[in-house]
Amino acid sequence: MQPDLHCRTLAAHTLKHFRALSPLTHCMTNDVVQTFTANTLLALGASPAMVIDPVEARPFAAIANALLVNVGTLTASRADAMRAAVESAYDAKTPWTLDPVAVGALEFRRRFCLDLLSLRPAAIRGNASEILALSGMALGGRGVDTTEAALAALPAAQALAHQIDCIVVVTREIDYVTNGQRTLSIPGGDPLMTRIVGTGCALSAVVAASCALPGAALDNVASACCWMKLAGQAAAERSEGPGSFIPAFLDALYHLDVEAANEEN
C-alpha cells in the first residue's frame, strides 16, 4: 500500500478550524518537555492543560477536548494517573493519543502501553523503533532515538492501525500517517528539529489536539504533522542553531500560513 502525499490545501483549511475551536488539550506528558509542549499548543491556537495528579486527572480528562499520554518519564504513580485519565476519556468519548516513548527499550512502559491499547486510542505517534516495538514486530531502540527508517515501520504501523482501529503516525524525515487502509506521507521539516528536546513530544500533543476536530481523523492528524514540518522549515531559515531555533519555531507556529507556504513551494 503506497502512501499518498498529504494535501497542503487541506492542511490550511484544517488549521483554520483548529484555531477557531482552540481545543482544550489535557497533556499528561514527560517532565522534560512540559513547557515546550504547552507553548507549542498555545502558539498554534490550542489550550493546553498539564493536569497530572490522579485525583484531578480522572475528572479533567472527561471535560477536555483531547488527552495526550506520553510515557517519557513514566513512574508507578504517574502510570496510575494516566490510566485513570484514559479510562475517564474512554467513558466520555474524549479522543486520546498515546506517545509510547522508548517503549521497545524498557519493559515497564512496554507493558503499560500495551495494556492501554484496550482502551482504544484515537491516535498513536512514535518513531519507527517505537511503532515496531508496540506492534510486536521488533524490540529495541535506544530510548527516544530511532534506529529504523520510518518507511521500514510502515507495515507495522498499518497493521497496528487496523488492529486498534486508530490513526498511527510514524515520524522521521518523512512522516507517515495511516488508518490501516489509507496512508499519507508528509515530507519537510529540518534536521534542526532533531537537535532540540521535545519536537516529537510536542507533535504528539498537536496530534492529540487535532483529534478533537470534526471530520476525517486521518486528514486532521496528517495536517497536524504538516503544520509542524512547515514551522520547522521556516524556523530553520531564521535561526543559527538550536538555541535560536526554539523561539523561531514558536514564532513560526504562531504566524503559520499554510496557504502562503503552499504558494511559495
Swiss-Prot record:
Gene3D superfamilies referenced in this protein's UniProt entry, alphabetically: 3.40.1190.20
Name what cofactor the protein needs: Mg(2+)
Species name for this entry?
A: Salmonella paratyphi C (strain RKS4594)
The terms under GO molecular function for this entry are: ATP binding; hydroxyethylthiazole kinase activity; magnesium ion binding
Q: Which family does it belong to?
A: Belongs to the Thz kinase family.
Q: In the Enzyme Commission scheme, what number(s) does this protein have?
A: 2.7.1.50
A GO biological process this protein is involved in?
thiamine diphosphate biosynthetic process
Annotated pathway: Cofactor biosynthesis; thiamine diphosphate biosynthesis; 4-methyl-5-(2-phosphoethyl)-thiazole from 5-(2-hydroxyethyl)-4-methylthiazole: step 1/1
Which enzyme class?
transferase
The molecule here is called Hydroxyethylthiazole kinase
Q: Which UniProt keywords apply?
A: ATP-binding, Kinase, Magnesium, Metal-binding, Nucleotide-binding, Thiamine biosynthesis, Transferase
Q: What positions does the entry give for substrate binding? A: 50, 198
